[in-house]
Amino acid sequence: MTNANMQGKIRIYDLARDLGRDNRDVMAVCQRLGIAHKTHSSTISEQEADSIREAFQRGLPPGGRKKAKIQQQGAAAANKQQILEVRRPPVGYQPPVRTEVSQILVSTVTPAVPTEAQPLPIPTLPELPVPEQVAEQAAAPSVQEAVEPIAVSPVTSPLPIDAADVEADNYTADEDSMPISIAQTVVEAPAAPTSEAAPPEPEPTPLPAPAAEAPQPVRPPAPPAPAKPTPAPAPAPRPTAEQPSEPRRPQPPAQPPSRPEKRGGPLIAPNRGGLQPTRPVPAQPAPQTPTRSGSGIAKKGAITKAGSGSGGGRPGGPMRRRDEREAAVVDEQPKILLLSGNISVQDLAQRMHVPTTEIIKTLFMKSVMVNINQTLDQATAELVARELGYEVQAETAVAQATKTEMLDVGDIESLEVRPPVVTIMGHVDHGKTSLLDAIRSARVAEGEAGGITQHIGAYQIEVPTEAGPRKLVFLDTPGHEAFTAMRARGAKVTDITVLVVAADDGVKPQTIEAISHAKAAGVPILVAINKVDKPDANPERVKQELTEYDLVPEEWGGKTVMVPVSAKQKLNLDLLLENLLLVADYELELMANPNRQAKGTIIEANLDKARGPVATALVQNGTLHVGDIIVVGSIFGKVRALYDDRGNRVDAAPPSMPVEVLGLTDVPQAGDEFEVYSDEREARRIADERTSKARENRLQQQMASRRVSLGAFSAQAQEGELKELALIIRADVQGSVEAIRASLEKLPQDKVQLRVLQAAAGEVSETDIDLAAASNAVILSFSTTLASGARQAAEQAGVDVREYDVIYKLLEDIQLAMEGLLDPELVEEALGGAEVRQVFPVGKGQVAGCYVKEGKLLRNAQMRVRRGKEVVFEGHVDSLKRFKEDAKEVATGFECGVGSDKFASWQPGDLIECFRMVTQKRTLN
């Protein structure tokens, strides 16, 4: 056993030797199976080798290539007239040898139009003289096997047959009982062609072993379809005894048609001798002229070039033409690659059916170093695919949950009106939460750290109307720039957006962003101009600024409702609610089916110390009950309890009701869909599948983040090891975790790289302390607490735990910490300058008599001597004297003598620059 076998690998030529096959046979099967290889010396895995062995056991005869070749040459004359249809070869499949004839396994087809079969007499032809070579082959035992009967199973054809084809099929119905002589020659009878655009052929099924009692299938001697059918059919002349035909050259192998890879069936058809049962295909008659090779009829489905010969001429002609036809077929079908995200180099190579070395080489030429197991992001994978001639298309991603997608076809008959979902959006500190508090008569804003909202709150209120109380659902989103994802999530599930703009501040960046989110979600916008009670309020200026973003007030001829309000004074709140109900009634059609299993979206999620994972869910269709089996993204759970926005326990949540859900096995991601299932086993299976896919995507992203370009690698090698700051993030809710990670990724990381080891909702535990101690990481605790014993463990292990309540303070500290990891840089600090007025010889050297023009000169400081534009010396001030006395420094406006041990070529007019090198703290910018 070779070393490759011992390592779980085997070379192709070793496998071919074990199977008794030619290397080209095995390579052809490798290509058919999609196994990457280059030569017969390439190695494949043991699993791939088993697939090849299984294919050969189902396919090629055990005698190898030589025996198959003798059988095919001997049976060529008997099988010539039976090839009524030649199928196209599959894309990428290369036949092993020109003279091998792949046998087609098809079954007879019952015509779609039943007609009364009329038996036709078979013409009796005289015996032809057989050449010696053919006679020897006919005497071989393999030829005797070729004439044994084969059972044929009829299959109903899905192809429609028009009236013109029925006449051609009549003579083929009842001729299976007619005998055929082995010496019978090809009868080139006229036939009608089938439709060019035929649907895919049915899968071939292996034929049973020949039985002595099985009836002998007989086919009429019909030729293949002509290359150029003509409207005037004429029977082709047959060879006679006086004009013996020359021995025919074996025909090129007829390959099975290309099929999708997922379809079953044998990869290699068994190479049986004898007559092959074929499906009768009507062909259009055309005049044929017998040639020396007798292959003047173009194959059905083949693509021929203008002026191509009929098969005669130098050897290799049919092989060459077949290769041209296969190349033409390949060119016809564009190579399309579907990508849905990050992908490893090995998976990309398997999808494109190219060696992995080709992808590695392509990226190397673009200064990107990767290995076979490395993950490429989607942009890089698309670049490689286009370089290799593939057209990249994005796989249809599963759409995220929206209010319209929650409705199914079966809900139409049971739809009822549901309350509208209103999202409060706007710039930070413009009074969004205060306005909602005034509507709810609550004080949520007082509990927010720093006075800014840092997570989504969902609330339900009742509005008294003349027809009775009506419900409104409010979502309060953060206005800080770090919480972009939360605002986008709020706009995604909302029906109406209330844009809060401060009358004394006007339109700000987060106001513009909120407008963009609302327009992208396609929801109507209602503007609440807040703080109109302040002295410097200017509502008209706010309206003017909003017109720049296509929000024109109704009183100016537009369609946007703008209501001046005051959250503190509770001014015009009833008018705001009234307009919300008007927009919901006249512009929207809000319906849901409460009599079905619930579906919806997770608005927020957190880990509670006493209650476990808690998710704030918005039911968008159906009714959520206690005890329901629920799947949230990749998390399975059973609803243990439901709480409304005021903390009251409820048994069910109808559509558009926000509730807190208890009973999940883990903290879900904010924005995930949830759905209730009746079968617990099915729910667990779906959750497990999503978990596996999420884990794979997470690993791919981690691998993609470690990819290093050649330029960056060289720079890091010159400057030393790249600095890295490891972090562990813990926050109160999942949305805050997302916001922190997104904000950290925006920090410059060219000099110091951030590596987030863990990021999740929940308190800081002792496990986090152990991980931080082992990896020298810093723990960031955002609006959460430390578990019992965690603080003491952190002090003992020396782990830095930073606690924050406001996100921008966290970002400032992290940036300072990243800058602290940078080595200080040396910068030049200018001290002064002097001009050489006169040169004095002193001993063996010279001293420059100077006049200090600016700053001061210091002894032992560094100096630079300039003569014109050229620097003639750079060194230290070794001696500094004033009136023959040593001086430590000489200030501006005084004369002095300057000397250096390493420079004596002073000249009047030289300029002296005195400076020193100092260290300076580096910044990320």
UniProtKB/Swiss-Prot annotation:
It is found in: Cytoplasm. The keyword Transmembrane helix does not apply. Its main location: cytoplasm. One of its GO terms (biological process) is translational initiation. InterPro entries: EF-G-like_DII, IF2_II, IF2_N, P-loop_NTPase, Small_GTP-bd, T_Tr_GTP-bd_dom, TF_IF2_bacterial-like, TIF_IF2. GO terms for cellular component: cytoplasm; cytosol. CDD domains: IF2_eIF5B (cd01887), IF2_mtIF2_II (cd03702), mtIF2_IVc (cd03692). Residues 566-568 are annotated as: G5. Residues 426-433 are annotated as: G1. Signal peptide: none annotated. Residues 451-455 are annotated as: G2. Coiled coil: none annotated. Residues 289-307 have a biased composition (Low complexity). Residues 320-329 have a biased composition (Basic and acidic residues). Residues 190-329 are annotated as: Disordered. The keyword Nucleotide-binding applies. Residues 530-533 are annotated as: G4. GTP binds at residues 426-433, 476-480, 530-533. Keywords: Cytoplasm, GTP-binding, Initiation factor, Nucleotide-binding, Protein biosynthesis. Residues 476-479 are annotated as: G3. Residues 199-209, 217-238, 279-288 have a biased composition (Pro residues). Belongs to the TRAFAC class translation factor GTPase superfamily. Classic translation factor GTPase family. IF-2 subfamily. This is Translation initiation factor IF-2.
